[in-house]
Amino acid sequence: MSESLVLLAPAANHVYAGQAGRLCAAELSLTCPNATSVAPVTVAGVEYLSIHSEDPLPPADLAAVARSSAALACFEYRGDLLAPLELPQVDVVDEDLVTIPKYRGKTNEQFTRLLLNLTLASLEGRCATRRDEGQRLAILDPLAGRGTTLECAWRAGHNGFGVEQDAKAVEALAAHVTTWLRRKHLKHSCGTHPVRRDGRSLGKRFDAKVRFPQAEPLTMGVFTGDAADSAVLWGRKTFDAVVTDAPYGVVHGSHSGASRRRSPTDLLREAIPVWAGQLRHGGALGMSWNTLGLSREHLVTILSAAGLTPLDDDLWHQFSHRVDSSIHRDLIVAVKP
C-alpha cells in the first residue's frame, strides 16, 4: 500500500477555505482512478490530503491531482519523510485569466474548477474518448455571467461557450479577456458583433480565439440572451459538457418582450430540457445550486425527465457546503445516454 500527501493551495475566500480540504478529497475520490481512499490529515500541524493506493500514483492520477481544485504540491509519504512528486503541467493558459477579475457575486474559482473536473470525469462514449485523447472539448455555460466557467475551460485546454442575459456582464468579460490576451502577447483575435436572424435582432456575440504554436487554437463565444434560448442562439452546435452555476434566488428572467420573473426552480425546469438537447450522447451536465431553494430530489426528477441519468450514489453526496447564511450550495452531475 502506497500513501501520497497533497498539500492544499490557499483559498482567498475564508469560508470556502475552511471546506476546501473536504471538497477536494471528495473530488479526488471520483477523479483519481487508482485511489482506494482520500481523506484530510494533519501532519506536523499542516493540513494535507492523504491518498492511499495499491501502488505509487501513476501518471493519470498525478494529472488528476495537478488539475484538481485545491492541490498545490504532492509528496510520497515514506515513513516520517515526504518525497516530492513532480506534477505534470496541465494548465494551457495562466491561472490569472481566472483569478484577476474581482466582483460581487463571482463564483469561487476553485469551486468552478472542481465542478468542471467532476463533469468532465463523468463523460462517456465518444466524449470520454475525445477527453482521453487530449482533444479540445466544447464546454457550454448557459448562465455564463462574467465567464468564470469559460475561463476555467480555457485554463484546462477546452473551448468555452456561453449565454448571458446581462449585456454588461458580457461587456466586462470581453474587456477582461481582450486585455488579458494583449498583456500576455498571445496571438489572438477577438471582438463583439450584433447578431441578426430572419430580420430580427438576437443580441450580441463576443468571440475570442487564441493561437498556439503547434497546437489547436482555443476558442470562446458568448451570446447575450436568455438561458432557456440557448439552443436557438447556438443552433445545431452540440457540446461535450454543460457546466453551470444556477442562480441562488435572484430574478433571472428574459429581457425579450415583457419582462418575465422566474424563480430559479422555474428557470431550471424550463431550461434543463433545452440544455440536455444540446449535449452530445455521452456528454454530461454539471450544475451547482442553492439547496435552500430547491431540494436534491426535485432536481434529480427534473434532470431525469429531461432524459439525463443523474449520478446520485453516496460518493456524489459529499459536496454540500455553506456559502453564506442564505446559500447552501451543492452540485450534481447527470449524463446523457
Model region roles, listed by residue range:
Residues S2-L82:
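N-terminal auxiliary segments of SAM/dcSAM-dependent transferases
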